[in-house]
Structure formats: structure tokens, C-alpha cells
Amino acid sequence: IASHATQSTWTFYTMEKFKWNEKMVGYSLGFVGLMIAIVQGGLIRIVIPKLGQKKSIYIGLTLYVIGFVCFAFATKSWMMFAFVIPFSLGGICGPALQGVMSGQVPANQQGELQGALTSLISVTSIVGPLLMTNLFSYFTAADAPVYFPGAPFLMGAVLTLFSVLFAVRS
């Protein structure tokens, strides 16, 4: 659900807070894509074997929290580009987490595990955008108790922090 803070509100947030136009949003999303490609396409193969899966999960989730908080409180347009870097590096946690889960399930149940994970992602793809766009709308409305367009990112940080705590306990 936390990831939908970025996926669902990036455009709204950057246009509201920094007055970005469609072209600038496009550049920023292109940069996000480039960073994700670097992490997913190469860095994971280096980092996860060196750190191990569990440490990669903790570090990745922590980097996501840092990224979310930085996005929420960014004050200058350029900061969004800078903060994409730690946020994207958080992507090391996904493959590490899948590796840990796959290691806990026998070979004949791998398909069931992957199906369950896909179903879970589908559910979060329903709940996440609704939650995050409504938070954004609430905190940017004229009658909002406090103007805070970064609220969805802060919610993303809180939800991811719960994931960190859950990962540490298990």
C-alpha cells in the first residue's frame, strides 16, 4: 500500500507543491525509471549477495522510509530528483524479500506462493490509490486543517516503518 503514495500522487504532488508542468513531471518519471532500472537491472546482483537477504530487506525498507519522508518535506524542486536516489535504492528489498519467502516454501508450492503474492499486490492496488489520493485531496483542500500535500508520502513512510518493525520481529 505504501508504494502507492508515489505511484498515485507523484504527479499531483509535484504539480501542486512545485508547480511542475507535464514536461517536468515526464522528466522526473523518466529519472525514476532510470534509477529503478539501475537498481533492478544490476545493483541487486551485487548488493544482495554481499549484504545477504535479511540485511538487504532491512536496508531497503529503511531507504524507502527515508525517501518517503524526504519527499513529504521537500522544499525545492531539485530535491525531488535527489530524493529519488535513496528511494530507488530501497528497491533492493523486494527481490531479497521474495528470496526469503521462496526459501521458506517447498519447490512444489512455489506457484502457490507466487499466486498469493500476486493476489496481495492486486488488493493493495485497489486500496493504495484510494487511500493515497484521498489523503492528498484532504490535505490540499481549501478547508484542510493544515495544508500538507506531502501527507501521502508521510503515510507511506509510516506504513513502511511498520514493515521494518515486522521484518525485525520475524
Q: Where in this protein do the model-derived segments appear?
A:
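A late C-terminal transmembrane helix in Major Facilitator Superfamily
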Residues: Q110-T140
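Intracellular juxtamembrane helix-capping segments at the cytosolic ends
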Residues: I92-P106
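Structural signature of the two symmetry-related core transmembrane helices
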Residues: K55-C70
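Helix-loop junctions at membrane interfaces in 12-TM secondary transporters
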Residues: F71-V84, C93
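Helix-to-loop junctions at the C-terminal end of transmembrane segments
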Residues: V39-Q53, F136
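Loop-to-transmembrane helix entry/capping segments in MFS-fold secondary transporters
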Residues: E22-K23, V105-S119, V146-P149
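A membrane-interface helix-boundary motif in multi-pass transporters
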Residues: N134-T160
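Short amphipathic helix-loop junctions that connect adjacent transmembrane helices
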Residues: S8-S28
